Amino acid sequence: GASGRNGGMLPPRYKKGYAAIAKRYGNDVSRRLHGLMLEAVDTVEAIVEDCDIDCDFHRSGQLTAAHSSEHLRSLEADRDWMASEAGDKAARILDRHQTMDEVGGGSHVGGWLDPRGAGIHPLNYTRGLATALLARGVEIYGRTPVLRLVEEPASVRVETPRGSIRARHAVIATNAYTDATGFAPGKLDRRIVAINTSVIATRPLSANVAATELPARRMVADTKHIMNWYRITPDNCVIFGGRGDITGRSDNPGVYAMLERQIVETFPQIGEARIGQRWSGKIAV
């Protein structure tokens, strides 16, 4: 799930924040997670370069837009923790006016900016990975659902409708659909939670409007409990995501109408820009 569905944002920060993670789990755990998050973005960049994948990877920076003074103080605590406990001083705090300059609208009181955040075209990245793997001799079987994983003394047996495969290791990369597999009860329970998300995308904006609304082309997410996130694509479409239908419906017009109101509130100059695409589905957190 989400291989081609998500917004293609690679943030170097968790929504919870490193200071909050450290308070609950300790500095060592938070430092490890901090390193893993930075490594993840670096790894994707290295794969894109090594495999020559055309997927619009670019480090335009990640902006977390605070919706309250309390949220801004939390971002400031995160910046301070990173500097003192991880020796990382890359991120900086923006005031209200600096944040407005970055976003062009909305009601943010400030923000967090990390230049290491990146954007990517997720479906083209997935296709590029498949092409690179096939070129290296990897066999990919589509339309072959895994029915069962059986752990054996020295291997794992993967059972499918077309036969079984034995391997030393099996990677369960099922994202939001892990609960449906039943592969590893107890091992993955409550570690991966599926949520429904909905996304809209405008038709291409004029160069002038695009330069006004997201001039630095940041990857942006806000700090609301049910957050909105947004970015601009290389062809000047704004992708804007948020909460999906709680029942899992992918065609709820009320959800899309809500997103259309929110995108205009965030980007007033977009006005009645036509929406070119709408989609919904599950992603994992």
Region roles according to the model:
Residues S30-L33, M37-V41, H71-L75, A118, ...:
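Generic structural signal for well-ordered, non-membrane alpha-helical segments
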Residues Y14-A19, G104-G105, D235-C237:
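Short connector loops/turns at beta-strand edges and beta->alpha or beta->beta junctions
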Residues G61-H71, P115-G119, P145-V146, I246-G248:
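Conserved short loop/turn motifs at secondary-structure junctions
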Residues A91-D95, E139-Y141, R274-R278:
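General small-molecule cofactor/ligand-binding pocket signal
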Residues R73-E85, G106-H169:
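Helical element adjacent to the flavin cofactor pocket in flavoenzyme catalytic cores
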Residues G1-G7:
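Glycine-rich FAD pyrophosphate-binding loop
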Residues G1, D42, D50-R59, V146-R148, ...:
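Active-site substrate-recognition segment that forms the wall
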Residues R13-H97:
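Dinucleotide-binding Rossmann-like beta1-alpha1 core, especially the glycine-rich loop
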